[in-house]
Each structure stands twice: as C-alpha cells, then as structure tokens.
Amino acid sequence: MKFHEMTYTRPDINALLATCQTLAARAAAAPDGDALVALYYEQSQAFADYTTASQLANIHYTCDTRDAYWKAEQDFFDANGPAVANAQVEISRAFLSNPHVDALTHHFGTTCVAGMKNAVLGMDDRTVDLQKEFNALVSQYQQIYGGALVELDGKQLTIPQLGPYKEDLDPAVRRAAYEAEAGYFDAHREELDQLYTQIVKNLNQQAQVLGYKDYSQLSYVRMNRIGYGQAEIQAFRDQVARDVVPELQKVMAMRAKRTGIPHPTFTDLPIIFKDGNPKPIPGYQARMDAARTMYHELSPETAEFIDFMQDNELFDVESRPGKMSGGYMTSLPSYKAPFIFANWNDTSGDVDVLTHECGHAFEGYVAQRDPHVPADLECPAMESAEIHSMAMEFLTAPWHHLLFGKDSEKYALLHAEDSFVFLAYGCAVDEFQHIMYQNPDLTPDQRNAEWLKLEKKYRPWIDFDNLPFYGRGAGWQRQLHIYECPFYYIDYCLSTMAALQFFLLSLEDHQDAWQRYLKLVRRAGLASYTELLQTAGLKVPFAEGSVKGIAQQMTQWLEAHQV
C-alpha cells in the first residue's frame, strides 16, 4: 500500500488502557509457559494499531509542522503517551510476576525478560512529577538553542545556518562564524549553567527515589543496556584513550598535510580537503535511481526492500518550508512498512542520511516479515540498532560512485575518517556525564575545567586559540544529548566499533561481510549487543586489547587512501 493510501484513525485511549488492564491480569495468571508466550505475542499485537496511528501522525506533523490538523493529533499523542507507557510497564510487571516467566527467555532469547525488568526498574509513579519537571527543563534548553539568531555577513542566521561559513575556505570567515555562535552562548551563559545544575539535580533525585546512588547508575537501566554496565564502558573508554587517540593524532597530522594548514586551530577542523568537500550528484530522481541500482546489486534482500520502499512512497527526504529538521526512520507495524524522513541540503550528508536510515529501515523490513519476532522486539537497544545503520553506510561503499561520480574517493576518505575520529569525542562526552552526575556539587567553572581536561585526554590535537565560549571549556553545552538525553552518546561509539569492523571485513571479502551483517540483522531485537557482535564474528570492544588492532588497521587504510 502506498503511503498516501494509508488511513489514519485517532485511537480510543480508554479502550486501549482497558485492554492493557485485561492483558496484565491474564499475564499474571497464565497457567503455563506456552500460554505466556502466546499472550506475549497477543499484547505485542495489541499495540500495533496504536503505534501505527501515533507514527502516522508524527510523520505527517514533521513533514509539515504548520498543518493544524496534524499538530492537534501530535498533541494528542504527546498528552496520552505517558499513560500508555505506564500501562505497558504494568503489563511487563505482570509478566515478570508469573512463575513461568522463564518460558519467555527460552522462546525469545535474553532481551525479552531483561528488557521488561529494565522497564519496571526504571519507571515508578513516584518519579512522574520529576519526569514532567525534567521535560520542562529540556524544553527551556531547546528554546534557548532553537531560538538562536546571530548576526553575520549582514544577515540574521540560526546556528545550523552558520554551517557553510564554518566550512568556508577563508580562515577569517570561519573564525567570524565561530565567534558569532560563541557570542550567543556566552550571552546565555547563566541560563545554560543554571539549567544544567537543575537537570543533574532532577535526574539524581529520580535515581535516588528508585534506589540508585545517582543517575549514572539509573541511566544503564533506562537505556536498556543488557549484559554490561559502567565497568565495561569504562574499560572501553580506557582503550580509546590509550590505543585510539595516538592513532587519531597520526590521522589529524595527515589531514593537516592534506589541507595545507600546518598548525590547525579549532576553527580549521571543518576543512577536510583543500578544494572543498565531496558533492553528491544533483536531483532527487537521479539519486533515487542510483539508490535502487545500488540496493539491487548489493543483494536480493536489499533489492526487494528498496523496491518496496520506493514503490510505496516511503521516503520523504527533500527539504522544504514547514518541514522539521533532522532525519529518522520509523515503523508502521500495521502495514509492515518502514518510513524514512530526511532533509537533503546538497552536501555529502545527503548520502550519509540515505544509507544510514536505509540501514535502520532494512532491519525493520526484515524483522516485520519474521513471524517469530513480536512487534515490540523488532528492534534492539540503541547501541545495537545503530549498527544496522552505520554498517550500511560502509557496506554500500562499492556503489558510492553512482551517487558521487568523480568525488567518490574523497567521500570514502571523508566518511571513514569522520567515523574513526568521532570515537574520541563520543568517549569524552560519556566520561564527562559520569563525572557530572557523580559529582553534582561542581560549580559551572569546575564543570568547564573538567571538560577541558577531557579535551586534552581525548582530543589533544585541538588548539582553541583563545576562542570565546569554547576556550573556557563550555563547548559541551552545544551538545544537545548532554541536556536532552543524558548517557545516550556512548551508543554511537559502541555501534561505530561494529561498523568499522564491517568496513575492514568488507575490504577483505565484501560478500562475507554482507552475510555476517545479514545474520546480525536477522536476530532483530532478540539479542543483546554482545550477542549480536558474536553472531557476526566481531570483536566485543569491552575486552582488553580488542580496540587496538581495529584502530591500527583504520590508520593504515586512511594513510593509503589520502587524496
């Protein structure tokens, strides 16, 4: 069914909540394991129509935020979502209370029961008011960030609109863009500092209500991390600091040589090539045709997938007035259809977002067609879900010439270098947040001092050159995740470690790498991060010595592919 033919009906929330109560009672009383498994499929299906309606409303709203009808529908789901989420937690609580609960682990694998336990441990009626307060604090941050208008080049510009100026080949233009941005954040320094103080206090209070020492502990439950905790994450970060950072210093030296900027400062970092970044081919249809060819040649599975997506109008990727920024993939379970949303802007990022979201969508498409996989276990936790997308960016590389033409070698270098270099920043963000929540009484200046220490630890090549805002250690306040979804950022690092391994495997034997990826995808949300990596024969980055070899291979490839 084509997207425009999909019908929307606002769900009856009271009827859904009544169904939830019935399902919870039946889950608690199920007489044996078989009955419990059957009921799990039933409760999963019970939410399919609600999820489909909520996602249809969200897609229509984000595609045109000015449409009053879809705005009202989005408001409806925002208002009723918490009640539905609480009802789902109560169903989980009922399943867990059943003496036959082990049957779910036997049938579905490790993540089903572990995920329900995390849902129950991370939510409680006693934290509802604190959660509302946290949402309000995040909204205040979004207003400060989203409301930014700065003066540059005789124009009033938003923060995203500064992007082209930051990449200008003239260093004076770049510096002016960064100073304009810094001036805005410095002007709101007190508000941003105060908001973060309140956010740390709020989330630590939530943690203490639920019996945890601080939010750094609770976050592992809320992020549904299964099979690892703080010790494993610290072991990974330690390896990045010890084994990856020295390799990245070599990579940054190569970049300095390539760009002809011998002593780059912070404002020089966006310059990747002397003559500008790679540009994809122009034109929506030309790109869509290239994507169809690419996925037809990659595998029979992706050929079927891309035909379904394009034939059913399941892409909305062109930017236009009224459309929300960003990119995402979502699922419409009642139609077994993924949907991809993006905002192309004629940069190499257009190809990043296409291949990235197609990775998410392909996994969703495969899981939706597997009768063994219930709808709520189609997708794994975030650190694993991002493997599908990030690995797809690399596994489509043999066809990137279709999308970049003469610039395909530049794109290959840019993409691999960016992915590798990101590990250092991602680990700095994660370690910073652990320090903040474990030391909630730090003053704003002390917080900034901690950030500068981490910059030296993870990105020692950076010279802030007395730049306002960044130079005083406040650059972390630009990172939305730190305010909006604390402790999420390390997920990108964990998935990058898997994606880089798929990249290196594909250089040796692309077909073997693809078959390993397909195995991982087919496990859907039924396996943990560690289990998924083991399924594909990849190294788990928590193990001592697992990161060094990958880092050295990446440096060698980058050295051999300078353009």
Residue ranges: model-predicted function:
Residues R237-V251, P280-D307:
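Zn2+-dependent metallopeptidase catalytic core
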Residues I261-A290, F420-F422, C427:
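Long, K/E/R/D-enriched contiguous segments that form extended
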Residues T110, G115-K117, G227, E318, ...:
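C-terminal, non-catalytic "cap/extension" segments appended to globular domains
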Residues P280-Y284, Y335-T355:
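Short pre-active-site segment immediately N-terminal to the catalytic Zn-binding motif
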Residues M1-P278:
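A well-structured
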Residues R242-D243, Q368, C379-D407, V421, ...:
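Post-HExxH zinc-binding segment in Zn-dependent metallohydrolases
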Residues P164, P280-P282, F315-A337:
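Catalytic zinc-binding patch centered on the HExxH motif and its immediate surroundings
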Residues G359-P374, L395:
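Catalytic Zn2+-binding segment of zinc metalloproteases
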